[in-house]
Amino acid sequence: MMADNSNQPREYDAVLGGHSQIPIAGAVLGGIAGVKQRFNSPSIEARIAAVKDAPKYGGAGLNLAIEALLDPAAEVQRVAYLILRSRTEPLVRQALKDFVPYKLFDCIRTVKTGTNVAISPGGDRTASLHGKIIRICDVDTGEILYTLEKYPRAQETFVLCQESEVFVRSRNTPKHRAIEIWHEGELRHTSLGHEGEITAIVISPDSQVIASGSADTTIKIWNLETGKLMCTFGSLLTWGAHKAGIVSLAFSPIAQTLASSSSDGTIKLWNLRSRECSQTIKGYANCLAMSPDGQTLATGGWDRNIQLRQLSNPDSSITLAGHFNSINAIAFSPDGLTVVSASADGNIKFWNASTGENFYTLSGHQSSVTCLTFSSDGETIISGSIDKTVKTWGVN
């Protein structure tokens, strides 16, 4: 049976009675008392060492690690967060729920890719164009999972499904405007119907339907499983439809509402059950996102600003200003408390969704950031850029 050495001196243990050497009459504080003494030190290194030791001392140690999340030094916060995030104790989970880790984010992985990058909603896979080939790759390793050929002289837009196995792309040629649904590299369905260039595609969070928007001013809803057209929102069929080409689309989390923006200067909300336009908001938007509770709409534009609107009162909005170029993509954190934006200025910004405060900025891409998403657990974000890289950002 090993002796309990928890009270024996360790590196950074506080010594009473001296500074440079342990005096004969000095006393060394060990155990949790020593950890607390080191944690109260002005030395960042001493506080980090204390936090690393803290979990050895049960509940008292965990309380100290939780307290370290509020330390003024980001280095100490980072160590505490990395120690605590895998713990399951209710007290720890609550503390992490109240903690915002994004201000500790750095680039933890960079993978070379192609152009026209798309990222799956969970951040597991990417699709990108490499010359005449579209590659679908694993985000973590960069491994090529399968490839597809690009159509000659065709303009293409593509998206990946939540489950990642499904790949959807638009094919715009002078003769054809088609939606193609692929499963692990095998073409399942080709859906025709748009008369103009297909400019936007989005898959519902429940992976049941696809929405496509076109320069022909219409929005079409397709069944993802069968490829069949379910309905069309257009000026000839629907009251309140857009009068110009569609720019961007976004589903609500439970896929009951679709948001659309158009070059006609309006943003519209569509009720997918009644198949009616439920709201029209004046404004231009290059990209859209809806909060996890479906109550807030975020819009980003060429004016470099982001607008947050409560759908219960869409005429009132919070403006998020700080980017130096147009906004290309927006996402909400899984808890809905943080908005993250990607811009043509090459930066990624984090915003408090309630106050509009920009509390952190990530720089690392060498060119315009075109897409981003949160990982399913919210612990990382994945971004794609014109610089032909996909970056994963998290606490390292």
PLM segments and residue spans:
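Extended repeat-based scaffolds of very large eukaryotic assembly and lipid-transport proteins
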Residues: M1-V111
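WD40/WD-repeat beta-propeller blade N-cap
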Residues: I108-G114, E149-Q155, L192-I198, F233-I246, ...
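Hydrophobic core register within WD40 beta-propeller blades
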Residues: V117, T157-F158, I201, L249, ...
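Residue-level detector of Asp-centered blade-edge/turn motifs that repeat once per structural unit
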Residues: P121-G122, Q162-E163, P205-D206, P253-I254, ...
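Hydrophobic beta-strand positions that form the internal "hydrophobic ladder"
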Residues: T126, V166-F167, I210, L258, ...
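Short coil/turn segments within WD40 beta-propeller repeats
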Residues: K132-I134, P174-I179, G196-T199, D216-K220, ...
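Short loop/turn segments that connect beta-strands within beta-propeller blades
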Residues: V139-G142, W182-E186, L224-G227, L272-R275, ...
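Blade-level signature of beta-propeller repeat domains, shared across WD40, Kelch, NHL, RCC1
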Residues: T370-N396
